[in-house]
Design a protein with these regions (language model features):
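Helix-loop-helix hairpin linking two adjacent transmembrane segments in secondary transporters
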Residues: 128, 157, 166-213
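Cytoplasmic helix-loop-helix junction between adjacent transmembrane helices
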Residues: 132-171
Length: 425
């Protein structure tokens, strides 16, 4: 009796080999296809709305300090409560998306956050505003937790760095436009009107996202059983690289948010006395982040994430050093370089998550972003204490300490062995 053996690859007729290749290509979305364009445009809109809704309040902090009679650290809560609840929500919405799917969770999240922002514009009390900002953050966790996972599942691995970079470019443009629009508008209209404008723009972005994002093709439902969830979290923390990437997210985002939370206070005071509208216009430094997130993401695909991560953190340190100088001609370029480095580093680190997490990718993305937004919330408010104690020098020392931790983590990540079955990263 003869045993049947599978034919070797060179024995398979070329027509069949072509069919096999075509089938594999159909699993992933390839660069240059209409599906790729729809996907990156939709996620760009989602990233835009997320960061615009979160960070539109940052230029308003000095104004809110005066209007509600709160200090700088208390004023920073309008951002910290949103990012803090977003971080908590990530631990819930990520696993939910692993069970029920990606697109429905993201669409619901965007519309809910936009509507909460519109409602916050009508709130007359500080505590009422903080409550709705907390709901904005909780809602946005549904997009933030799932977007990275969706891309890692649907986009071909060789293009994931570019796709993730374009998504983060949407974050950068949203953060810039949110700050720019409110920063300029509050010189001419009330902060309530400025918030209504941002909420309206986010509703438009949510509608575009809903209409053009392709449905998932590679999604496989996972159990929501507590044991299954615990196994996923345990597996990620046993990995040599993922906990380091989670720590990297915390310190990088903490440094970035702290700088932009308090640079406005510095520029409105002596020796600059800049107008509020002019301080708001400085949000154009985000343009460097728009470029770096896509460019560095693509370079990481070619040169490796290990090299690009520490290099972009070094750029952040150089930018911080420039902001410590007194001349405005050095401070503004420093903000530009710092922003370029941050978005480049975030693009590299976030695309690395999908390469390290071989299972339960939604949970891995949620843990990364939990750390990311926890860093924003904790360090963003702690920076207010540094400002109170030492002014901008105190803030600079605090940010510098965070970046030195980030650099040491990047060096450790560069020394990790490549996972079996993965290409070098």
């Amino acid at each position: 009796m003869k045993t049947a053996v599978a034919p070797l690859a060179h024995e398979i007729p070329s027509r069949v080999q072509d069919d096999v290749v075509t089938e594999l290509k159909d699993i992933y979305i390839e660069k240059g296809t209409p599906m790729f364009m729809r996907t990156v445009l939709a996620l760009f809109c989602g990233g835009f709305a997320t960061f615009a809704l979160l960070y539109c309040v940052q230029p308003m902090m000095p104004l809110l300090s005066r209007e509600f009679s709160v200090n700088a650290a208390q004023s920073s809560l309008i951002l910290s409560v949103a990012t803090g609840l977003l971080a908590v929500g990530l631990l819930i919405t990520g696993p939910i998306s692993d069970r029920i799917g990606r697109k429905s969770v993201m669409v619901t999240a965007l519309f809910a956050a936009a509507l909460c922002t519109v409602a916050s514009a009508m709130m007359p009390t500080w505590h009422g505003v903080l409550l709705l900002r907390a709901l904005v953050g909780l809602s946005l966790s549904g997009l933030a937790a799932v977007a990275m996972t969706y891309l890692s599942e649907e986009i071909h691995p060789k293009h994931i760095g570019l796709a993730m970079g374009l998504y983060i470019a949407g974050n950068a443009i949203g953060g810039m436009c949110g700050r720019l629009i409110t920063g300029v508008l509050i010189d001419f209209v009330s902060w309530h009107t400025a918030m209504l404008v941002i909420g309206g723009l986010a509703l438009i972005a949510a509608a575009v996202f809903w209409r053009i994002l392709p449905e998932s093709r590679n999604f496989r439902p996972r159990s929501l059983h507590p044991r299954s969830l615990l196994d996923g979290f345990t597996r990620h923390f046993r990995d040599a690289g993922l906990p380091l990437l989670f720590l990297e997210a915390f310190v990088l985002m903490g440094a970035f948010v702290t700088l932009f939370n308090y640079i406005g206070y510095r520029l409105l005071a002596e020796p600059y006395h800049l107008d509020q509208a002019l301080v708001g216009l400085l949000s154009v430094v985000y343009l460097s982040g728009i470029y770096s997130s896509a460019k560095v993401g693509a370079l990481a695909d070619k040169l490796g994430r290990r090299k690009m991560l520490w290099a972009t953190i070094a750029l952040m340190l150089a930018g911080l050093a420039l902001t410590m100088a007194t001349p405005l001609a050095l401070v503004i370029p420093g903000m530009l370089v710092f922003t370029f480095g941050f978005f480049g580093a975030h693009s590299v680190a976030s695309s690395w998550i999908g390469r390290r997490a071989l299972t339960a990718k939604g949970q891995a993305s949620s843990l990364y972003l939990f750390s990311y937004y926890a860093g924003s919330s904790v360090a963003g408010t702690a920076g207010g204490v540094a400002w109170h104690l030492g002014g901008w020098n105190g803030v600079g020392l605090f940010i510098g300490a965070l970046l030195l931790v980030a650099l040491s983590v990047a060096v450790k990540l560069a020394k990790l062995p490549v996972l079996p079955g993965n290409m070098p990263v």
